Regions:
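Alpha-helical elements of Rossmann-like donor-binding domains used by nucleotide-donor carbohydrate transfer enzymes
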Residues: 15, 41, 57, 66, ...
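N-terminal Rossmann-like dinucleotide-binding module
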Residues: 1-46, 175-176
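Short, Asp-centered acidic motifs that coordinate Mg2+ and/or phosphate
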Residues: 30, 66, 146
Length: 184
């Protein structure tokens, strides 16, 4: 079982914590959020989860194997960097960071330290996308010459990101997964 802590308990944090708790592969050890009011609910429903440790204490805790970062995009790089430097496996809500150079630095550091760095691109794991990939890989559909993607749900407005980093990244992760190559 992987002992995991979650940083960020705003919009996605509660969903992630719920899913981790329901998994038989994870033990949620702690949840950290700068806003203590956000974590009061979990302290009542799951009293065994430590709440609002300081970030420094959290990454120094040797009983924690991995940390999930579910915070605003502008914080992803620094938090992930500190977690990797502390020897923790890292799960980051998409996007990994706000620039490709920062992303590459995190990837290189994770490789150097032999740690898992996972970005939460969930769509490739949905049954619909897996079925389409199966059809493409089997050549059942023939050669795919064109792929069109339409975003019909804009989600929450993100003040620290743009539509490409926040939403189009879902479509790009699906395309890369389906065709095993970068879109042009």
């Amino acid at each position: 079982m992987i002992n995991i802590a979650v940083i960020g308990y705003g919009y996605w944090g509660p969903n992630l914590v719920r899913n981790l708790i329901n998994s038989n592969k994870f033990n949620v050890k702690a949840v950290f959020d700068l806003d203590q009011q956000k974590t009061q609910v979990i302290s009542k429903t799951h009293p065994n989860i430590e709440i609002n440790k300081s970030f420094t204490e959290l990454i120094s805790d040797n009983s924690i194997d991995a940390i999930a970062i579910v915070t605003p995009i502008s914080t992803h790089y620094k938090l992930a960097l500190d977690c990797l430097n502390a020897g923790k496996h890292v799960f980051v809500e998409k996007p990994l960071s706000d620039s490709s150079s920062k992303c590459q630095k995190l990837i290189d550091l994770a490789d150097l330290k032999k740690l898992v760095l996972f970005v939460d691109h969930t769509f490739p794991y949905t049954e619909a996308v897996k079925k389409v990939k199966e059809l493409i890989d089997s050549d059942h559909l023939g050669k795919i010459l064109y792929f069109d993607s339409t975003r019909i749900n804009l989600g929450l407005f993100q003040f620290d990101s743009n539509v490409i980093w926040d939403l189009a990244i879902h479509d790009l992760s699906i395309i890369i997964n389906l065709f095993n190559e970068m879109p042009i």
